[in-house]
Amino acid sequence: MNSPTKVPVTILTGFLGSGKTTLLNRILSEEHGKRIAVIENEYGEVGIDQALVINADEEIFEMSNGCICCTVRGDLIRVLGNLMKRRDKFDYILLETTGLADPGPVAQTFFMDDEIASEFSLDGIVTLVDAHHINQQLGRSQESTEQIAFADVILLNKTDLVKAEELDALETRLREMNRLARVHRCERANVAISTVLNLEAFNLEQVLADHPTFLEPEYPFEWTGVYALSPGSYELSLDDGPDPTMSLAMLERL
């Protein structure tokens, strides 16, 4: 059960093109009467609908239906701290990850920092899955596998693009990958807001049973955010060489 003194947080994840931003825009445009703060990653494939924005001059801005939205331009912990200065304007946080992100380190944030842990409660992780492309994505991306493995709720989206028998086989595969997640089928990310919020689904004990190293740093350095670099050439230097567990793909993204 969520603590009445903490702000509940849902992490919204899913591979590129799965429908995360479509769902966010739906939530931000509906008159649902809820006061939701949306944390949108600046490097998402598609931004929020600017027609819904009242004032976007600052990092945190208000939407036309009373929700507020902010963009991660650096350290997530700093953004959460700034958001808490407007605590009287929201009751819930919806946090979108990038399509290429493993949600595990994002979820870690709410347990590894004492101040964050005292103010926020991780309510659940919702993963959107593109029914039309997920089989190919699972074959070439570890991140898409982790997004499904960490999910408390899986939204099997774009079901109108897949034949019924293929859809049944896909849902069976997803349930084999994550035996505890609730699976909902949808088109155009059209789901009830109750499917995403107030889940009371994240279970730290269960996560530690499935991922024993969840509360341990994944790499020997702290993640401080994502930063944009101007075009040009850069040299990356790592003390003692790269960690042997880091893949070439990870180094290329760095």
Whereabouts are the PLM-identified features?
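Short, ordered loop/turn segments at secondary-structure junctions
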Residues: 41-43, 159, 188
